[in-house]
């Protein structure tokens, strides 16, 4: 983050039910409009080929996408946000991102531990992530651009509301809708095995644990 920030208030705004730590992912319902999802390492799966020549694997109830030899992405959880102070009296929301990992090796799986990555991101970080993913696809394999569609992010504040930007952007209902949109976006990305394989370095950099500035 470019701004020098201080976290206020001490406790994050709760936008989610704390009991719902493993939300149900409804990716199939939006797959037709958003592009294919590929997955692996699941017990209940069916596969078919799409028009782009890629294999789509539908799995229930678990999906995962390999990030390295040891772990696969299992799901992402965008939870409560914290309102922070930036320069010049501005305020913005920082989201807590938790990505759950599934061990690929029996040695890790036998430990029955919960493997996860946790970091903090602003909406603008998601915007840059999407831009970087699109640039990578266009540069590396432009013919795959239609097959590896990147879902849209939840909208930013509309121009006609810019005069009350702070009020709109920090509204709890607005933030709750943004949380759901960011969570869908991130899950769509990390559960697409073809996309992960092509953009692994970009995703790893995005998920690098953040240092919170007091």
From Swiss-Prot:
Chief subcellular site?
membrane
Disordered, as annotated region: 1-63
Which biological processes are named by the entry's GO terms? protein localization to membrane
Q: Could you tell me the superkingdom of the organism this chain comes from?
A: Eukaryota
Query: PROSITE patterns of this UniProt entry?
Result: PX
- The biased composition feature labelled Low complexity covers 38-58
> PTM Phosphoserine: at which residues?
65-66
**At which positions is motif PxP?**
5-15
Q: Which residues form the PX domain?
A: 73-213
Q: Name one GO molecular function term.
A: protein-macromolecule adaptor activity
Where does it localize?
Answer: Endosome membrane; Vacuole membrane
Acidic residues bias locations: 16-31
Q: Which UniProt keywords apply?
A: Endosome, Membrane, Phosphoprotein, Vacuole
Q: How does it sit in the membrane?
A: Peripheral membrane protein
Q: Which InterPro entries match?
A: PX_dom, PX_dom_sf, Ypt35_PX
Q: List, alphabetically, the Pfam families matched.
A: PX (PF00787)
One GO CC term, this protein = endosome membrane
Family membership: Belongs to the YPT35 family.
**Function, as annotated:** Recruits the lipid transfer protein VPS13 to endosomal and vacuolar membranes.
Its UniProt domain note says:
The PX domain binds phosphatidylinositol 3-phosphate (PtdIns(3)P) which is necessary for peripheral membrane localization.
- Subunit and interaction comment: Interacts with RBD2, YIF1, YIP1 and YIP4.
- Name the UniProt record assigns to this protein: Endosomal/vacuolar adapter protein YPT35
**Biological source species:** Saccharomyces cerevisiae (strain YJM789) (Baker's yeast)
């Amino acid at each position: 983050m470019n701004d020098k920030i201080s976290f206020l208030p001490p406790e994050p705004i709760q936008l989610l039910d704390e009991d719902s730590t493993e939300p149900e992912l409804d990716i199939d319902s939006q797959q037709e409009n958003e592009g294919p999802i590929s997955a692996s390492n699941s017990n209940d799966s069916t596969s078919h080929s799409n028009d782009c020549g890629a294999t789509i694997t539908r799995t229930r109830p678990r999906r995962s996408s390999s990030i390295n030899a040891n772990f696969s992405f299992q799901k992402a959880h965008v939870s409560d946000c914290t309102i922070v102070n930036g320069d010049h009296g501005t305020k913005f929301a920082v989201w807590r991102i938790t990505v759950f990992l599934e061990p690929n090796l029996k040695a890790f799986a036998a430990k029955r531990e919960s493997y996860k990555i946790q970091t903090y991101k602003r909406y603008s970080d998601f915007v840059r992530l999407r831009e970087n993913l699109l640039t990578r696809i266009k540069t590396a394999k432009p013919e795959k651009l239609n097959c590896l569609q990147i879902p849209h992010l939840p909208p930013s504040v509309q121009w006609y509301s810019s005069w009350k930007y702070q009020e709109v952007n920090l509204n709890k209902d607005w933030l709750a809708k943004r949380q759901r949109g960011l969570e869908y976006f991130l899950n769509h990305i990390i559960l697409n095995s073809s996309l992960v394989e092509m953009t692994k370095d970009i995703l790893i950099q995005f998920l690098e644990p953040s240092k919170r500035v007091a």
